[in-house]
């Protein structure tokens, strides 16, 4: 609170995240930033969560920020068989969307604004429009991916045939004001017009122009050209302001010490500076046994020290296999003298900030890429699904890292151990990438510092929300 008054003189912002750590994490970090900027914050939650990690994360957040109000949103019964999807996270998005019309009682005045997850915006907008409540979107991927999402409905309309199908004649998708995006980089689920993902993708894409603004966890040095094009209204006519508020910083509770983190940090302390390649594919990706073996062989053949985080199942509640079962006995024995392999939660921020870490092999999840940028760690991006190829292109364009297009993605992953090893060697020995990464790290520090671009953006938003206090 400021000296000039109590809570009522400050904006009151509600946030409604969606399922998955990739969506929840930036929401909680944004909420923490809003608290630090003297906003009142309400967090709208749904239970049970899909993963145990989500439940724990929300619990730790609310304990760390007791001034945040939690409101639980009770969803209508939902039959997964009624949706054309099997992904548990996608099904939860749909369950929230189908219950969105019941949100109004949780949005009772006085609220200055609601910040909605991108996956929910088309379902939530009618509620906020009816309440005359400003609705902002937190887009949880790159600005480059947002440019595709916002322009895709118009692109589909221009490619539709008389039979209702969509045909793309070229190998690229043209986006006004920006370089074209290879068709091969577009998430395959978007191209299946009958899929649940494609339907909601189009509906959400059409809704941005009706929102009051879009917040993105990015900053100028990472995606300058894309942000300029978006705010110049060159991508989509009538698009509201796009606010680059990144890099969003980890909450204090994320820095908690536990036996696993202590073990990892102790091991890193014993390694030479810049010698370790960190390998992690996020909270949702579990490699096949075959691809896990190829990656292990690649790490060994690279000759580099490594810290490798593995997953056995997509949903952590179902992941009961031991590390030895995931890796196999032979690979487990081979790697123990060259690296450390863990199969549990890792404090990624502490890992990336450690002096021993000199490179990061990532799946291309946007939160991970922004964390690498903030710590100046060069990237080898290995996209697997969703927005990850487009995120990889953004990283490559910024000079922060590289990716190998021939490695495939989804069910077509085809990277071999020797290729992986060579690319990791290249990553760890690439002076140009290292210099670029350090430059971007410095720009990230400036963006969130006093008078920086992201700090100014937060103040601009808060000033807007203060004005809303007078009318809501």
UniProtKB/Swiss-Prot annotation:
GO terms for molecular function: 2-hydroxyflavanone C-glucosyltransferase activity; UDP-glucosyltransferase activity. Signal peptide: none annotated. Keywords: Glycosyltransferase, Transferase. The active site is at 23 (proton acceptor), 117 (charge relay). UDP-alpha-D-glucose binds at residues 140, 346, 348, 363, 366-368, 371, 387-388. Optimum pH is 8.0-11.0. Its EC number is 2.4.1.360. Expressed at low levels in leaves, flowers and immature leaves. Gene3D superfamilies: Glycogen Phosphorylase B. Optimum temperature is 45 degrees Celsius. Belongs to the UDP-glycosyltransferase family. UDP-glucose-dependent glucosyltransferase catalyzing the C-glucosylation of 2-hydroxyflavanones (2-hydroxylnaringenin and 2-hydroxypinocembrin) and phloretin. No activity with flavanones, flavones or flavonols. Exhibits C-glucosylation activity toward 2-phenyl-2',4',6'-trihydroxyacetophenone. Can use UDP-xylose as sugar donor, but catalytic efficiency is much lower toward UDP-xylose than toward UDP-glucose. This is UDP-glycosyltransferase 708G2. It comes from Citrus unshiu.
């Amino acid at each position: 609170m400021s000296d000039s008054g109590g809570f009522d003189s400050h904006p009151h912002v509600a946030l409604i995240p969606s399922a998955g750590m990739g969506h929840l994490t930036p929401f909680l970090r944004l909420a923490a930033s809003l608290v630090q900027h003297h906003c009142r914050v309400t967090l709208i939650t749904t239970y049970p969560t899909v993963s145990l990690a989500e439940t724990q994360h929300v619990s730790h957040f609310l304990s760390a920020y007791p001034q945040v109000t939690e409101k639980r949103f009770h969803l209508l019964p939902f039959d997964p068989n009624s949706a054309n999807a099997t992904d548990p996270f996608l099904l939860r998005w749909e369950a929230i969307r189908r219950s969105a019309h019941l949100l109004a009682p949780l949005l009772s005045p006085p609220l200055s604004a609601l910040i909605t997850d991108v996956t929910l915006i088309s379902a939530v907008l009618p509620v906020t429009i009816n309440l005359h409540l400003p609705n902002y979107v937190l887009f949880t991927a790159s600005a480059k991916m947002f440019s595709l999402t916002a322009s895709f409905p118009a692109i589909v309309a221009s490619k539709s045939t008389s039979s209702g199908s969509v045909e793309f004649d070229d190998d690229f998708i043209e986006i006004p004001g920006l370089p074209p995006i290879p068709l091969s980089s577009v998430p395959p689920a978007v191209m299946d017009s009958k899929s649940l993902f494609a339907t909601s993708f189009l509906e959400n894409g059409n809704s941005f122009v009706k929102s009051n603004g879009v917040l993105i966890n990015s900053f100028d040095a990472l995606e300058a050209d894309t942000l300029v094009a978006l705010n110049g209204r060159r991508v989509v006519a009538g698009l509201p302001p796009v606010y680059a508020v990144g890099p969003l910083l980890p909450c204090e509770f994320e820095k908690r010490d536990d036996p696993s983190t202590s073990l990892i940090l102790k091991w890193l302390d014993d390694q030479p500076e810049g010698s370790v390649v960190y390998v992690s594919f996020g909270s949702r990706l579990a490699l096949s046994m075959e691809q896990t073996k190829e990656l292990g062989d690649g790490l060994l053949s690279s000759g580099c020290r490594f810290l490798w985080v593995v997953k056995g199942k997509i949903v952590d509640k179902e992941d009961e296999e031991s590390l030895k079962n995931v890796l196999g006995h032979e690979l487990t024995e081979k790697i123990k003298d060259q690296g450390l392999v863990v199969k549990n939660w890792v404090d990624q921020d502490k890992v990336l900030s450690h002096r021993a870490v000199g490179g990061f092999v990532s799946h291309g999840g946007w939160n991970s890429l922004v964390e690498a940028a903030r710590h100046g760690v060069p990237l080898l991006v290995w996209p697997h699904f969703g927005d990850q190829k487009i995120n990889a292109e953004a990283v490559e364009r910024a000079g922060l890292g590289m990716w190998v297009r021939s490695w495939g993605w989804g069910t077509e992953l085809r990277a071999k151990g020797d290729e992986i090893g060579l690319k990791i060697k290249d990553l760890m020995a690439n002076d140009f990438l290292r210099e670029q990464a350090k430059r971007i790290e410095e720009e990230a520090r400036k963006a969130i510092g006093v008078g920086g671009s992201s700090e100014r953006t937060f103040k601009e938003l808060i000033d807007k929300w203060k004005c809303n206090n007078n009318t809501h």
